[in-house]
Regions:
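N-terminal amphipathic alpha-helix/helix-capping segment at the start of soluble metabolic enzymes
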Residues: 1-17, 88-97
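C-terminal extensions of enzymes
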Residues: 274-294, 298-333
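Short glycine/proline- and acidic residue-enriched helix-loop micro-motifs
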Residues: 71-80, 217
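N-terminal binding-site loop/beta-alpha segment at the start of enzyme catalytic domains
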Residues: 7-8, 14-32
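Short strand->helix junction
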Residues: 23, 113, 271-272
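A compact, surface-exposed functional segment
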Residues: 255-287
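Alpha/beta enzyme core
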Residues: 27-67, 84-105, 109-244, 249-265, ...
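Short, basic, glycine/proline-bearing loop/turn elements
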Residues: 10-17, 75-79, 167-169
Length: 333
């Protein structure tokens, strides 16, 4: 049974990738991911804010009340464990890439041109097989237009591609007015992969203390449908690889991602809940499902239910919204 896939120009033995998580903090835990059989690993992110803290002489530690730390806030490390700055991150990345054989993807989380363009080359020089950049920006300025935010993102992607030679994945937010258009622009700017989606955390209000506080939860497959919809819509319409991250909790979730067109499936919460060996469950279940449907490889399944190929493309559009609403009813008195 062929589970081999291509992602970011790399041939992987199967589509399951360990996403950015605390397993990336230490060399021995990355080795555990490799030994368990993950196809690749995304290292934990280097955050723009922690770099600026170092430069300003303040302690480089993430503030758990700062909602900008969208990706890793729930895995808040102890101060003694935190990677303080770009050079320490690069040194750790260098050691990891020399110690394991699976591809190691560096990760950069920022929102300004300076941070992306300054630190992307460092990650490449450290030996990363690819770079994943995470775009996170909350535009609170009512004078800033949607077009301006989109142009800023696209220009930064284009600039990074001009600086580094390793493949570039862009982890996007779903909160764009016309997401398909933005994804197409990022694709045309040179992104080698689109990762759907960055997981944002919303502020919570503590009515006792009257403060804004974080509420941190691991993702569940309730978050998956949004990712499935947009992967299905983009499949066959962009040249970039597609990866789904967030909401893949079970083998069936991974199969769904492949059916809508995902080339790779990133998993974090499931690894934290079940341990690195859970990848064996994912692989075995995928093999059994392919065999049950008389498919020799995942290539036969990938994109079978994409927007372009499905017999019912309206399922990804407004028609499904109406149908879903009418699927519920209340018995007559």
């Amino acid at each position: 049974m062929l589970l081999e896939t291509s992602y970011l120009g790399m041939r992987l033995p199967h589509p399951f990738i360990a996403g950015a998580s605390p397993f990336g903090y230490h060399l021995d835990t990355v080795k555990r991911l490799e030994d368990a059989g993950w196809a690749a690993v995304v290292l934990h992110s280097l955050f723009e804010e922690q770099v600026s803290m170092v430069r300003e002489g303040r302690i480089a530690h993430m503030n758990p009340d700062d909602q900008r730390f969208a990706e890793m806030i729930e895995y808040f490390p102890k101060q003694s464990d935190f990677r303080y700055g770009p050079h320490e991150y690069a040194e750790h990345l260098y050691r990891v890439t020399r110690a394991v054989k699976i591809p190691v993807i560096g990760s950069l989380n920022g929102h300004t041109r300076e941070s992306w363009l300054t630190f992307a080359p460092l990650i490449e020089q450290a030996g990363a097989a690819a770079l994943e950049v995470n775009w996170y920006e909350v535009n609170t300025d009512a004078r800033a237009s949607a077009a301006y935010a989109e142009e800023e993102l696209v220009e930064m992607v284009r600039d990074i591609k001009g600086l580094v030679k390793i493949p570039l994945a862009v982890k996007l937010s779903p909160f764009f007015t016309a997401f398909a258009n933005v994804a197409s622009q990022v694709d045309e700017a040179g992104a080698d992969a689109l990762v759907l989606f960055n997981r944002f955390y919303q502020p919570e209000i503590d009515v006792t203390t009257m403060q804004v506080v974080p509420r941190l939860h691991l993702s569940t497959n309730a978050e998956l449908p949004l990712r499935l919809r947009w992967a299905a819509i983009l499949c066959g319409r962009v040249n970039a690889s597609l990866a789904i991250t967030g909401g893949v909790a079970t083998p069936h979730d991974g199969i769904k991602a492949i059916l809508v067109g995902a080339d790779a499936v990133q998993m974090v919460s499931a690894v934290l809940n079940h341990g690195p060996s859970y990848v064996t469950v994912m692989r075995t279940s995928l093999e059994q499902w392919l065999d049950w449907h008389n498919m020799a490889s995942i290539a036969e399944a990938r994109g079978r239910l994409s927007h372009r190929t499905t017999e019912n493309p309206a399922a990804y559009e407004r028609a499904n919204y109406i149908r879903t609403l009418h699927s519920w009813g209340v018995p007559a008195a």
